[in-house]
């Protein structure tokens, strides 16, 4: 029994069920706009149903992935820019699937906060919906967790989960990579969703003005540009040529992500002057006095995805990707190496 016979509600404890229900209603149209024919449920149920398109596949493989946005969220929270980090969340997941040739099918999100702000959450989910539309996958469910005492006021965290499908014979796993193959770099929109702990430290040390101009726009806009989603461009390319490997350039940069899709005894020789690096990376390197090696093992430095193709398919691949709106640069080649483990040589 409480003192003075006071009745304590869940809302008194910091959890507003009505706010949660209102959010579900607010995001139903967002989810509906992403629907695919295979989806047979709507938001609000205990589980989401998705009928696999078995008539399109002989031997399908399901490919799954999960990711977050990292400390880019801190910049979003501090700047009040919540409408694009949802795109980042989807991008980080679906870009990981497409490197294996998998078409994203459906996506789920997890939104955790200390006190639910319906408007902030709705903006975030609207971005998730936009990311799902860009990648052609359905937003079929999620979880909103209001956990008083776990997060400071105004803070939230995100996680995303995605499942895709690929014909087993079409799986892209890097085993076909060989000396002489060409590295095609697809331009990024900025830092994407990696390296923000470094970026935030540089902002702090410099006392940077986030409204200062960077390549014709406020610095904060350059830093918060949503991660580019490459799914539809890669799916279109797969129909035209054989892709030997794809690497999503995330945390670890070119130095650590290219070897993940290369066989032993190979080296990727990359010309770092072969593409136009966005000005935001110049700002980061200059204001942080960041060394060359550190830049390329922390940030994508202007290349968000690398596609490895046979030399004979180079121009066809460039034409196909350009037709999809990608900015493509020939950034290097695969060479033979005496090292048993894959190497990257940046010049």
Swiss-Prot record:
EC number, UniProt record: 6.3.3.1
CDD domains: PurM
Keywords (A to Z) from UniProt: ATP-binding, Cytoplasm, Ligase, Nucleotide-binding, Purine biosynthesis
Catalytic activity as recorded in UniProt: 2-formamido-N(1)-(5-O-phospho-beta-D-ribosyl)acetamidine + ATP = 5-amino-1-(5-phospho-beta-D-ribosyl)imidazole + ADP + phosphate + H(+)
Single biological process term from Gene Ontology: adenine biosynthetic process
One Gene Ontology term of the molecular function aspect: phosphoribosylformylglycinamidine cyclo-ligase activity
ATP-binding among keywords: yes
Pathway(s) of this molecule: Purine metabolism; IMP biosynthesis via de novo pathway; 5-amino-1-(5-phospho-D-ribosyl)imidazole from N(2)-formyl-N(1)-(5-phospho-D-ribosyl)glycinamide: step 2/2
Any one of the GO CC terms: cytosol
Subcellular location: Cytoplasm
One Pfam family in the UniProt entry: AIRS
Protein family per UniProt: Belongs to the AIR synthase family.
NCBIfam families reported for this sequence: purM (TIGR00878)
Name by which UniProt lists this protein: Phosphoribosylformylglycinamidine cyclo-ligase
Organism annotation: Hydrogenovibrio crunogenus (strain DSM 25203 / XCL-2)
Gene assigned in the entry: purM
């Amino acid at each position: 029994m409480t003192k003075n016979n006071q009745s304590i509600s869940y809302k008194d404890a910091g959890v507003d069920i009505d706010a949660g229900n209102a959010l579900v209603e607010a995001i139903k149209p967002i989810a509906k706009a992403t629907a695919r024919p295979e989806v047979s449920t709507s938001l609000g149920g205990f589980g989401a149903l998705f009928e696999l398109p078995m008539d399109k596949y002989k031997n399908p493989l399901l490919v799954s992935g999960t990711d977050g946005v990292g400390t880019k969220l801190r910049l979003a929270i501090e700047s009040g820019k919540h409408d694009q980090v949802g795109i980042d969340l989807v991008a980080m997941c679906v870009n990981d699937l497409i490197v294996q040739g998998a078409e994203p099918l459906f996506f789920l999100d997890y939104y955790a906060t200390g006190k639910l702000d319906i408007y902030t959450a709705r903006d975030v989910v609207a971005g998730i919906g936009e990311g799902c539309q860009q990648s052609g996958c359905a937003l079929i469910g999620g979880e909103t967790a209001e956990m008083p005492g776990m997060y400071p006021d105004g803070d939230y965290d995100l996680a995303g989960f995605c499942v895709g499908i690929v014909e087993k014979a079409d799986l892209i796993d890097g085993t076909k990579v060989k000396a002489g193959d060409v590295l095609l770099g697809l331009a990024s929109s900025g830092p994407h969703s990696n390296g923000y702990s470094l970026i935030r430290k540089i902002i702090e040390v410099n006392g940077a003005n986030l409204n200062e101009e960077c390549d014709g726009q406020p610095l904060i806009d350059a830093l918060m540009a949503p991660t580019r989603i490459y799914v539809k461009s890669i799916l279109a390319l797969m129909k035209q040529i054989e892709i030997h490997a794809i690497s999503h350039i995330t945390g670890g940069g070119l130095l650590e992500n290219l070897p993940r899709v290369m066989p032993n005894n190979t080296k990727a020789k990359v010309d770092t002057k072969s593409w136009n690096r966005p000005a935001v990376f110049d700002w980061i390197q200059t204001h942080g006095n960041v060394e060359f090696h550190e830049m390329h093992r922390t940030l994508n430095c202007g290349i968000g995805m690398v596609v490895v193709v046979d030399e004979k398919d180079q121009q066809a691949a460039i034409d196909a990707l350009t037709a999809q709106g990608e900015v493509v640069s020939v950034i290097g080649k695969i060479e033979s190496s005496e090292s048993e483990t894959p190497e990257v040589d940046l010049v």
